[in-house]
């Protein structure tokens, strides 16, 4: 039978291992998501076209501009850009979009606007994965050192 102090010591080790497993699984899922996002972005880069556009207003500072452009088919599109960019009001910019869905796919033709999502998810996934493996490794080492050897 395990003593009270033995039970108290076992719980943190079990918790450390459990947290390590959860963080490793979450990190793995995020890394898979980042890989899928990167593949989607590569396909977008292959099939999209680039046209000139203009910043018509800043919604919440320079990182959230409203962009207007005209597609190659002559359609006028205006869309809000996400936060991985920094531009000034009235600036001329390049816009990249998929011809079959310009309003849904438009984004500035900059590294951050195009690859920011995949890199953010990948970076977070790597941190979760490494942190989880570290906790798992630490918990397993503590568990092994606490076992009685026969």
Residue map of PLM features:
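Short acidic, glycine-rich loop/turn motifs
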Residues: 69-73, 97
């Amino acid at each position: 039978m395990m003593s009270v102090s033995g039970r108290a010591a076992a719980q943190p080790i079990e918790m450390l291992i459990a947290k390590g497993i959860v963080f490793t699984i979450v990190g793995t899922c995020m890394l898979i998501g980042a890989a899928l996002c990167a593949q989607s972005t590569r396909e977008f880069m292959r099939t999209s076209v680039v046209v000139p556009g203009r910043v018509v207003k800043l919604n919440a500072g320079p990182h959230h501009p409203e962009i207007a452009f005209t597609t190659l088919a002559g359609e006028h599109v205006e869309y809000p850009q996400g936060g991985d960019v920094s531009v000034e009001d009235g600036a001329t910019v390049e816009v990249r979009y998929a011809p079959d869905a310009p309003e849904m796919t438009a984004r500035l033709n900059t590294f951050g606007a195009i690859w920011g999502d995949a890199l953010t998810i990948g970076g977070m996934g790597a941190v979760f994965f490494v942190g989880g493996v570290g906790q798992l490794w630490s918990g397993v080492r503590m568990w092994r050192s606490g076992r009685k050897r026969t």
